[in-house]
From Swiss-Prot:
Propeptide: 1-46
Function: Somatostatin inhibits the release of somatotropin.
Cystine bridges: 63-74
Protein's recorded name: Somatostatin-2
Organism of derivation: Myoxocephalus scorpius (Shorthorn sculpin)
Single Gene Ontology BP annotation: regulation of cell migration
Amino acid sequence: ARGAGLLSQDWSAVEDLLAQMSLPEADAQREAEVVSVATGGRLNLESVDPPNNIPLRERKAGCKNFYWKGFTSC
């Protein structure tokens, strides 16, 4: 019986998360503001570097062709 109670709590948490994900963007923005106020305005986000911060030559893993004037585009 106790395990079933935990499962229902887990499912309700999943349902809440899915409901938040299905909200339109305006409602999600409002929800984020409510959460921000509830947490005292503190938000811990990890900064993610954009994927294009590596030079083009280094992103192309298999490109090692060299012409006397410079690297060729593969």
